[in-house]
UniProtKB/Swiss-Prot annotation:
It catalyses: cholesterol + reduced [NADPH--hemoprotein reductase] + O2 = 7alpha-hydroxycholesterol + oxidized [NADPH--hemoprotein reductase] + H2O + H(+). The lineage of its organism: Eukaryota, Metazoa, Chordata, Craniata, Vertebrata. It comes from Cricetulus griseus. This is Cholesterol 7-alpha-monooxygenase. PROSITE patterns: CYTOCHROME_P450. InterPro entries: Cholesterol_7a_monooxygenase (IPR030681), CYP450_sterol_14alpha_dmase (IPR050529), Cyt_P450 (IPR001128), Cyt_P450_CS (IPR017972), Cyt_P450_CYP7A1-type (IPR024204), Cyt_P450_E_grp-IV (IPR002403), Cyt_P450_sf (IPR036396). Heme binds at C444. One of its GO terms (biological process) is cellular response to cholesterol. Its EC number is 1.14.14.23.
């Protein structure tokens, strides 16, 4: 008589055989090389997740510039030749770039789909972002951010004894705290009826945001949030504060949020909590990548004496040209859009910091079967398959960026110290050479504001503070690979630094 263990063993073998026969895709003529992986459903997901860059490089060496991997039940075609990126984007009529993003948002934040095709709303969210994050709207948003950054960095009630003392703090923790508070106030305004509890509320939200953000990669991977009780509670608490009844009593709410409140109320069938969760999605999008990007920009600038010197000279010159005088009395400084855009050294520092730390995954879903025509050949793509670009491969390619792992603050400056816009790969000029914010239709609509708020932060840190690393020759912390594919990778460990207000 067969034992239970033997029965289970036979059952497992049968299941594996069924999987091999029916679940594994067979490569057809004209399709890219295929990696199914060994694990049902997951495919190559574990190998990809442990180190995406090395996984893709290994497959690039094995298969060439185009190959297909099964990841979490989906078939993903990776295009790894940066010279082909513009060719991919020319096939836009075959792509649905919204499907993945809408599905991910609903899954992670807990609202119904915001895709107008699903019938829950008729709002075109991309038009909303374009209208409120660019042009004249960007001017008012940047002005509010500059005011709020100065409010956070130089609070009006700061005792003189504290202003004269050196403060030692983790740099990532410092950037997280400052950028979250200033960014929250800029988007969602402030409750002037409760000034004493305003900061406590935001710091509570900061802690909730950290808890929720910690599990975000797992949510994107498809795990339900109910598996993470603390993160689920944190998400609901964050959303509670963003209900319309709470936002309506706040002053200086951004045009973006005011318009979204109006459109949610007039064009959607969302309940109050779902409306709040669509605002939570905006909060996450405004913070999750900006915070680590701010850290890397500040860290790399302070760590490089040449970068620190060049940035300080540029900022001092810009303030003098604008007639802005630094004062210990708390007078705010301000640079307009034109002045902020005319800071090529800071631009280059930020770009170089993001080049070294970004690991975004540019994704598009095939709406139908079609043939993808690239520089090095044509490939048949099946409906519902995913086309993916992983720009970190390009950002760290020595053929494009010599000595790619070294921070060079002037890498994006030409011989005239102006913005450098021409980069080459093996003698061929690249149309796309810097892509931390995505590309084409999927490019981040808030990228201009993100760069400006980082730039404003650096201007204020250079203007008001003396800055030092506790360990002057500290090594660059490794990147946290658990967030690969989501954007800017945070440091795996924090770096201590010292700061104190300058005597102006």
């Amino acid at each position: 008589m067969m034992t239970i263990s033997l029965i289970w063993g036979i059952a497992m073998v049968v299941c594996c055989c069924i999987w091999v026969i029916f679940d594994r895709r067979r490569r057809k003529a004209g399709e890219p090389p295929l990696e199914n992986g060994l694990i049902p459903y997951l495919g190559c997901a574990l190998k990809f997740g442990s180190n995406p860059l090395e996984f893709l490089r290994a497959n690039q060496r094995k298969h060439g510039h185009v190959f297909t991997c099964k990841l979490m039940g989906k078939y993903v075609h990776f295009i790894t030749n940066s010279l082909s990126y513009h060719k991919v984007l020319c096939h836009g009529k075959y792509f649905d770039w919204k499907k993945f993003h809408y599905t991910t948002s609903a899954k992670a934040f807990g609202h119904r789909s915001i895709d107008p095709n699903d019938g829950n709303t008729t709002e075109n969210i991309n038009n909303t972002f374009t209208k409120t994050l660019q042009g004249d709207a960007l001017h008012s948003l940047s002005e509010a951010m500059m005011q709020n950054l100065q409010f956070v960095l130089r609070p009006p009630d700061l005792p003189k004894s504290k202003s004269d003392a050196w403060v030692t703090e983790g740099m990532y923790a410092f950037c997280y705290r400052v950028m979250f508070e200033a960014g929250y106030l800029t988007l969602f305004g402030r409750d002037t009826s409760k000034p004493d509890t305003q900061r406590v509320l935001i710091l509570n939200n900061l802690n909730s945001f950290k808890q929720f953000d910690q599990v975000f990669p797992a949510l994107v991977a498809g795990l339900p949030i109910h598996l993470f009780k603390a993160a689920h509670k944190a998400r609901e608490q964050l959303a509670e504060g963003l209900k319309h009844e709470n936002l309506s009593v706040r002053d200086q709410v951004s045009e973006l949020i005011r318009l979204r409140m109006f459109l949610n109320d007039t064009l959607s069938t969302f309940d109050d909590m779902e409306k709040a969760k669509t605002h939570l999605a905006i909060l996450w999008a405004s913070q999750a990548n900006t915070i680590p990007a701010t850290f890397w920009s500040l860290f790399q600038m302070i760590r490089s004496p040449d970068a620190l010197r060049a940035a300080s000279e540029e900022v001092n010159g810009a303030l003098q040209s604008a007639g802005q005088k630094l004062s210990s009395e708390g007078n705010a400084i301000y640079l307009d859009q034109i002045q902020l855009n005319n800071l090529p050294v800071l631009d280059s520092i930020i770009k170089e910091a993001l080049r070294l730390s970004s690991a975004s995954l540019n994704i598009r879903t095939a709406k139908e079967d079609f043939t993808l025509h690239l520089e090095d050949g044509s490939y048949n793509i099946r409906k519902d398959d995913i086309i993916a670009l992983y720009p970190q491969l390009m950002h760290l390619d020595p053929a494009i960026y010599p000595d790619p792992l070294t921070f060079k603050y002037d890498r994006y400056l030409d011989e005239n110290k102006k913005a450098k816009t021409s980069f080459y790969s093996n003698g061929n000029k690249l149309k796309y050479f810097y892509m931390p914010f995505g590309s084409g239709a999927t490019i981040c609509p808030g990228r201009l504001f993100a760069v400006q708020e980082i730039k404003q932060f650096l201007i204020l840190m250079l203007s008001y503070f003396e800055l030092e690393l506790v360990e002057s020759h500290v090594k660059c912390p490794p990147l946290d690979q658990s967030r690969a594919g989501l954007g800017i990778l945070p440091p795996l460990n924090d770096i201590e630094f010292k700061y104190k207000l300058k005597h102006l």
